[in-house]
UniProtKB/Swiss-Prot annotation:
NCBIfam families (UniProt xref): PRK10159.1 (NF007544)
Pfam families, sorted: Porin_1
This protein's name: Outer membrane porin PhoE
Protein role: Uptake of inorganic phosphate, phosphorylated compounds, and some other negatively charged solutes.
GO biological process: monoatomic ion transmembrane transport
PROSITE patterns per the UniProt record, alphabetical: GRAM_NEG_PORIN
Gene: phoE
Provenance organism: Escherichia coli (strain K12)
Its membrane topology: Multi-pass membrane protein
Length: 351
C-alpha cells in the first residue's frame, strides 16, 4: 500500500525537529531560515513539583552565507521561553543552542559555541518519546552528553565523500567552572561515528568522551576522581512506517546524584513506534540507568521507567499527544529519587 502524503510528511518531521523551518531570506548566496514551536502541555502527577502547566515556546534561526564555491559560513541560535511562569519571574528564557562555523565541501564543517555533545549523536536515536525519554545518560550541561557550552566541533559526512553514510564527529570542550558544581566540566574531548551502510534502513553508532573534572567536583562526597568518561553504542531501524532504536552506554564519575556523582552507571534505552497513514503515531519505550558502587549505598537505580504514548498529527504543523511515564523506581530507594508516575497531555504547533 502506498504511504499517504500525511504519513510521509510526519516521518520527515520526526526525522528532523527543524524540518518545518520557514525561509525568510535567500539572495546573493545568503540564506536565513526561522523555525519554532509552541507546546501547550500539562503534567498530572502525585509529585507536586511535576504537576501542572509545563507549556513553553521554542524559537530559532539558521543562517548560511556562500563565501565561494567551496566554502560556506553558517550559524544557528535556538532559545526556549517558559509559558508557565509569572511575568515577574526572571527565569523565563534559556539559550539552547548558539554556534557559528565554516563548512568546506567534502572536508567537513567546524564550529564553536553552545551545541550538542558527541555522545548525543548516539543517544538522540532513542530520544523520541512524545514528551519524556532520552534521560538515562544524557543531561543538559553534563560534560558532552547533551547540549553544552564551549564546544568546538568538527563534523564530516560520508567520510570525505569516500564512504556513503559514514559520519564522523570530533569534539573538544573547554572547561566551565563558574556554575553549579554538577554542571561544571574540565577540558575534554569526544568523538562519534554513525554508519547507515550507504543509505540502508539500518544504522549503527558509537561515541566516546573523556574530560577533566574540576577541583570543586572532587570535593564532593561521592564520585571523586580526575577524569569523567563515557561511551555509548546504538542501533536504529527506520523504514516502512516503523521506527526502532536502542542504545547502551556507560559513564564514570560523570552522572550527577545526591552528594556528587555516580562512580559508574550502566544505561539502556529502547523505543518502538509506528506511523499510521492517517496521522497516529503510537510509541512504546523503556529507560534504565543503574548507578554502581555508590559510596554508602552500593548499586541503585537512578532512572527506571516504561513509557507508553501516542502523537496524532493533524497536518505538518499541528499535533496532539499523550505520554505516560510509568515509574519503576522503588519507593524506598536509597537516594530518595521521586518514584511517582507522570502523565503528559498537550498540543504542539510548529513551523
Amino acid at each position: 500500500m502506498k504511504k499517504s502524503t500525511l504519513a510521509l510528511v510526519v516521518m520527515g518531521i520526526v526525522a528532523s525537529a527543524s524540518v518545518q523551518a520557514a525561509e525568510i531570506y535567500n539572495k546573493d548566496g545568503n540564506k536565513l531560515d526561522v523555525y519554532g514551536k509552541v507546546k501547550a502541555m500539562h503534567y498530572m502527577s502525585d509529585n507536586a513539583s511535576k504537576d501542572g502547566d509545563q507549556s513553553y515556546i521554542r524559537f530559532g534561526f539558521k543562517g548560511e552565507t556562500q563565501i565561494n564555491d567551496q566554502l560556506t559560513g553558517y550559524g544557528r541560535w535556538e532559545a526556549e521561553f517558559a509559558g508557565n511562569k509569572a511575568e515577574s519571574d526572571t527565569a523565563q528564557q534559556k539559550t539552547r543552542l548558539a554556534f557559528a562555523g565554516l563548512k568546506y565541501k567534502d572536508l567537513g564543517s567546524f564550529d564553536y559555541g553552545r551545541n550538542l555533545g558527541a555522545l548525543y549523536d548516539v543517544e538522540a536515536w532513542t530520544d523520541m518519546f512524545p514528551e519524556f525519554g532520552g534521560d538515562s545518560s544524557a543531561q543538559t550541561d553534563n560534560f558532552m552528553t547533551k547540549r553544552a557550552s564551549g564546544l568546538a566541533t568538527y563534523r564530516n559526512t560520508d567520510f570525505f565523500g569516500v564512504i556513503d553514510g559514514l559520519n564522523l564527529t570530533l569534539q573538544y570542550q573547554g572547561k566551565n567552572e563558574n556554575r553549579d558544581v554538577k554542571k561544571q566540566n574540565g577540558d575534554g574531548f569526544g568523538t562519534s561515528l554513525t554508519y547507515d551502510f550507504g543509505g540502508s534502513d539500518f544504522a549503527i553508532s558509537g561515541a566516546y568522551t573523556n574530560s577533566d573534572r574540576t577541583n570543586e567536583q572532587n570535593l564532593q562526597s561521592r564520585g571523586t576522581g580526575k577524569r569523567a568518561e563515557a561511551w555509548a553504542t546504538g542501533l536504529k531501524y527506520d523504514a516502512n512506517n516503523i521506527y526502532l532504536a536502542t542504545f547502551y552506554s556507560e559513564t564514570r564519575k560523570m552522572t550527577p546524584i545526591t552528594g556528587g556523582f555516580a562512580n559508574k552507571t550502566q544505561n539502556f534505552e529502547a523505543v518502538a513506534q509506528y506511523q499510521f497513514d492517517f496521522g497516529l503515531r503510537p510509541s512504546l519505550g523503556y529507560v534504565l540507568s543503574k548507578g554502581k558502587d555508590i559510596e554508602g549505598i552500593g548499586d541503585e537505580d537512578l532512572v527506571n521507567y516504561i513509557d507508553v504514548g501516542a502523537t496524532y498529527y493533524f497536518n505538518k504543523n499541528m499535533s496532539a499527544f499523550v505520554d505516560y511515564k510509568i515509574n519503576q523506581l522503588d519507593s524506598d530507594n536509597k537516594l530518595n529519587i521521586n518514584n511517582d508516575d507522570i502523565v503528559a497531555v498537550g498540543m504542539t504547533y510548529q513551523f
